[in-house]
Amino acid sequence: MAKKSKIAKNEKRKEIVARYAERRAELKAIISNPNTSDEDRLDAQFELNSQPRDAAAVRVRNRDSHDGRPRGYLRKFGLSRVRMREMAHRGELPGVRKSSW
């Protein structure tokens, strides 16, 4: 199981990303728009750089929803491969069954 502090830090990052997401999207649209003046583009870049580092979505780590394991994460289930396998064997995941061919 992951350290509780790492899980808490990741949750805090998710909140910060959600708080700044709309403004970041606006600034990125201004920067990428070819019709934007150089001055406006520069202002948008400065504002984007002045935002907190954790406001970027790439700073959030996908973690297992049960124990916070950071590796082997399966998006479809929100679980790590280890936890998904355990739950599938116990029949706790609807629609999942062992394959055979």
Swiss-Prot record:
Entry superkingdom: Bacteria
GO biological process terms held by the UniProt record: translation
Region (Disordered): 53-72
Pfam families the record matches: Ribosomal_S14
Keyword Protease: no
Molecular function via GO: rRNA binding; structural constituent of ribosome
Compositionally skewed regions (Basic and acidic residues) per UniProt: 61-70
Subunit text: Part of the 30S ribosomal subunit. Contacts proteins S3 and S10.
PANTHER family xrefs: 30S RIBOSOMAL PROTEIN S14, SMALL RIBOSOMAL SUBUNIT PROTEIN US14A
HAMAP family: Ribosomal_uS14_1
Recorded family membership: Belongs to the universal ribosomal protein uS14 family.
Function of the molecule: Binds 16S rRNA, required for the assembly of 30S particles and may also be responsible for determining the conformation of the 16S rRNA at the A site.
Designated name of the protein: Small ribosomal subunit protein uS14
